[in-house]
Amino acid sequence: MIIDNLTIGKYISRPNRFTIEFKDKDKAITLAHLHDPGRLKELLIPNTDVLLKYINTYKETGRKTKYDVIAIKNKNNWILLNSSYHNKLVEELINTKEINSLENFHIDKPEIKYKNSRIDFLLKDDKNNPLYLEVKGCTLVEDTTAKFPDAPTKRGKKHVEELMEIHEKGIFTMVLILVLHNDADEFKPNYDTDIDFSQTLHEAYISGVKIYPLKINTELKNNSIILKKDRILSIKFKERNK
């Protein structure tokens, strides 16, 4: 996936969960919409380079901000911070058969309703067998270990529990975690931040729900971000009851 026509600014502050202040090339302070509601404390550091996309239709749509935050620099990496691209990226990877375990599947419906929730994708294989797929985005990496979530997520826990329910009916289910950091070599649930989600993810894994942390490499080239599939990372769960 390519996200083009980007501009670089300097991150200043985060007035609220969905807005940042940045300094543009003319040193003017401007607001931008931040689509990722996570804590991001290890990334949102003053004077850090941030990539932004100008939204031509911001007046017509009644937006208060002219820009969307796309990515932020961390060491020598660009980290995708715009979660609205997660499902678009997964859709592209499925359609181009780049995820080996899903190469026999196609997208039947996005945003499929289940009880009072919506699961990101309903896939079907060549024999019409369904697979319910939930997508999560992971930006937190400590040393070379990717960790999710970076903030407590009751909604995420609920999604995983629902996938376990579906799996118990004999239907394929999967959590696809997009690891959006070039330095990641393995994945571990973030027990310190959300023990309930982490234990639920482990239970789902044991029950047969497929948990795939898919590393995505990011490159900045000609004012564009290029996102490419790398590989499925190994998962490091804690021993149960510890």
UniProtKB/Swiss-Prot annotation:
Top-level division of the source organism's lineage: Archaea
Entry GO MF terms: DNA binding
Cross-referenced InterPro entries: SfsA, SfsA_C, SfsA_N
Spans through the membrane: none
CDD domains membership: SfsA-like_bacterial (cd22359)
Family statement drawn from the similarity comment of this UniProt entry: Belongs to the SfsA family.
NCBIfam families listed in its UniProt record: sfsA (TIGR00230)
Protein name (database record): Sugar fermentation stimulation protein homolog
Species of origin: Methanosphaera stadtmanae (strain ATCC 43021 / DSM 3091 / JCM 11832 / MCB-3)
